[in-house]
Amino acid sequence: MGLAIVLASIAVRGQAASQSPGLQIIPQPKQLNALPEVFRFRRDNRILLANPGSDDDRFAAQDFIDDLKASAGVAVVISKGRLHRGILVGRIDLPQIREVLRQAGLEVPTTLNTEGYVLIVGADQVIVAGKTEAGTFYGLQTLKQLVRGEGADAFIPAVKIVDWPTMRWRAVSDDISRGPVPTVDYIKRQIRTEAFFKMNMHSFYMEHTFASESNPLIGPTGGSLTPAEIRELVAYARRYHVELVPEQQTFGHLHKALRLEKYADLAETPDGDVLSPQQPGSYKLIADWYQELNELFPGQFFHIGADETFELGEGQSKAEAQAKGVGAIYFEHLNRVREVLKPYNRRLMFWGDIALHHPDLIGNVPKDMIVMNWQYGAADDYSSYLKPFKDAGLDQFVCPGAHNWNQIFPNLEAATKNIVNFVRDGQRAGAIGMMNTTWDDDGEALFESAWYPIVLGASASWQEGAVDIQEFDRDFDWSFFRSDGNEFVKAERALGSVPSLLNAGTTDELFWREPFGNQFINETRNLAERTHHMRRIVEDVAESVAKNENRARRNHSAVAAMLFAAQRYDHLGRRMEVVQKFSDEYWNAYLNLGDRVKVRKLRYYTGAIYNNLREMAEELSILKENYRRQWLAENRPYWLDSVLARYDQAIAMWLAKSRQIDEALRKYELSSTLPGPEEFGLGTRPSVPIPNR
């Protein structure tokens, strides 16, 4: 069949359409029409570049070839000459591409913006044509997801796609200042994976982790991005059409710099984290940092941070704040930073939280600055947060969150609602971009666990309107893991539901909470049924992941991250059950000291073979080693020991508690008495009768 047959009319134009059965693409294309025929790979498969001199197109084609070989076992080469059968790649305005599209009767819609592309698959030819080289690259990312089968059975279903992004900028912000600092290789993985889902911006959140040559004391050795690394990453990202944006804080969150005696005078309050606008040296520090960053990051933007300046007006600027208000000082600082950075001709981004607290002063923000409007609540409607900046004529990004911070695994119930609704409302308000944020507040978050919300943000910002979560989940396993079915997304969603199930704001905090105390033990009693249910859920996840892990042809490391999260959750549940049972049985023994049978049941917490307390330490030892491997797979060794120390402390605590109960039982054999339960931190007396066990 000829190519023209592929170009059947499209029922839905200019808006996101539900995908045809069997086609699983994230983000969903704007216009899509599928036909029953297929393009089958043969030994002589070739890719022809319409512009052989385009380094960008050659790179994009080779990237497609490498992925095809790795994921489907198919070999294709780039060749010259006329194309009779194979894949033609190039810009829409090139003569060869124009002629093919003319013969096919395809008119490129006026809505096709600079990152848009046309993808046509027929029985003999595949055409990937972008408005620019970026569009061609994105067309090839879609083509990767269309390839089905493996080896000699690999094929591409016949399809016509016309696609373009709804939002100009589709970004990820990665916190590299609260503990984990990714390796260069892992940042490259982030760039590749984000670009695969058509994201075009990656921002480094930095408080003290830029290895500044002008201020070398601030950046920790082994835990900072060096100039050489940045140059390498900028060049790498450019090939994937990803702009790297430095976010070097310029106001709050600077404690790790200000704690140094050299910079202590710049702090708004002693040992604080806000840079004082009263000190000229504050602006000298900012100027030094950004003079270096300007040489390293050649893009359009600087992100100056400036969120959560809680101490402003409480120290050096107190008198001025009393005279004219904290808000006025804040906006004056923004303008001063803008003047310092003006020679670099960048658009400055800043977090919008403080501005929202002073809506009457938003008009003081220069119109060339961009508001990074972060909101992390899971709301139905975000329009009230968007309206003040829209009314002021300011460009803004919507900045939802992956909800990975302080969690064993991201809270996907909160993240899904936050991302889908905030991006939808941002589009309605004319936001120019979306920046999905990951945070490492407690220093132990693993980025590899956060891909589901990251990919959801990519989909929400490319597509128009609200993402249909059922369709997104239907497509996720294929698009992300290149795996048929839905076993992995079910595991993601199950793990992501645990914070709500346990009614736990932060599951990391619950995991590390002191287990021997009234609060924890009473809470475990109240959550007993939920804990049992949670353990069944996460054990089902672990079993499913173990059975299916070899089916993941892409992003296999994310499977390991899910399995580790399931194991941590299971240990948390078991710990809650062990502590509750230990408390109940100790109280039962303490209230029945004359019943030696009941007392001797406490041997299950001291024995050489069966020892529930020692088992907790053993499980933690295994988790500790697993965590170490997970960490080093994506991060530098820097900061790892501070997290592993938490495991060591917990292991020592369980072993000490076992020795303590063993000593108590030895004394019981001599005196028929036991220490009071409060000495073991075993909570208050149970309010319901303790069952005989």
Model features per residue range: what roles?
Residues D67, G105-K342, M349, V398-P400, ...:
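Feature activates predominantly on carbohydrate-active enzymes
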Residues G14-M167, N421, E444:
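Contiguous, structured surface segment used for ligand recognition
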Residues R91, M206, T438:
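Short secondary-structure boundary segments
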